[in-house]
């Protein structure tokens, strides 16, 4: 259930701090194609060179990667939008070879691991993204949120997930309803139902007029009222979800 409420680095590329992954913004494909073309052209025509090793007359061929870390990341994002996940993984890893501390490459690998259900890998990558970013880096908001969802989906470290989500809210004012939604799910799992309802209703109040966003929040309210045994509110949310599904 949490997989469509994580941030993706494709969202950050649009120039805002973030947009919700539902699913998803990306670097323009045309731009990505240009990068791919540049990579192929440069690899074939520019980066292949011969080094002669003195009087022995030996020669070796060395290929040099012409792309920088950020270009590998953009190319990885293009592959992700096309569903070519393994190629995306290769590009993110190439970015890390060029820049071992690049937080967005770690974040991209974390998201792919998360979607595959490889939560330990996702947790490690998200933690690396956080460690490699400055404490006041606004991108940390999405790193914190996604790490929170690892803890939610594995039902562990829920208090830590709460702390991370609260830190995300401080870094990203615009994403408030997303983090309120995440908090609502955390409180539901902690059986703090009053706090869960307050957070989810606040998220609903601040949600844009977007059916996907509204559906996610209402699904969480649906689960909350089911656990509470609140039949009236459960029925109300059921009808609302039917309307949103039309």
Residues covered by each model-derived region:
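Short coil turns that delineate tetratricopeptide repeat
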Residues: 66, 100, 134, 138, ...
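TPR alpha-solenoid repeat register
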Residues: 71, 105, 139, 143, ...
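Residue-level recognition of tetratricopeptide repeat
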Residues: 77, 111, 149-150, 185, ...
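Register position in tetratricopeptide repeats
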Residues: 81, 115-116, 153-154, 189, ...
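Alpha-helical adaptor scaffolds
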Residues: 135-198, 205
């Amino acid at each position: 259930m949490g997989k469509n409420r994580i941030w993706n680095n494709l969202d950050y590329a649009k120039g805002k701090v973030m947009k919700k992954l539902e699913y998803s913004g990306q670097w323009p494909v045309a731009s990505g194609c240009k990068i791919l073309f540049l990579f192929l052209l440069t690899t074939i025509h520019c980066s292949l060179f011969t080094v002669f090793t003195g009087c022995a007359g030996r020669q070796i061929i060395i290929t040099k990667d012409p792309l920088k870390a950020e270009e590998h990341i953009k190319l990885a994002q293009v592959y992700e939008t096309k569903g070519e996940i393994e190629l995306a993984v290769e590009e993110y890893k190439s970015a890390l070879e060029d820049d071992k501390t690049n937080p967005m490459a770690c974040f991209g690998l974390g998201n792919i691991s998360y979607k595959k259900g490889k939560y330990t890998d996702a947790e490690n990558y998200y933690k690396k993204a956080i460690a490699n970013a400055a404490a006041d880096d606004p991108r940390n908001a999405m790193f914190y949120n996604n790490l929170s969802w690892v803890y939610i989906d594995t039902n562990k470290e829920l208090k830590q997930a709460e702390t991370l989500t609260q830190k995300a809210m401080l870094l990203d004012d615009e994403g408030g309803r997303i983090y309120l939604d995440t908090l609502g799910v955390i409180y539901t799992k902690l059986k703090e139902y009053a706090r869960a309802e307050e957070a989810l209703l606040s998220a609903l109040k601040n949600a844009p007029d977007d059916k996907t966003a509204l559906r996610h929040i209402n699904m969480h309210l649906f689960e909350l009222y089911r656990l509470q045994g609140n039949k009236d509110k459960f029925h109300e949310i059921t009808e609302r979800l039917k309307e949103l599904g039309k």
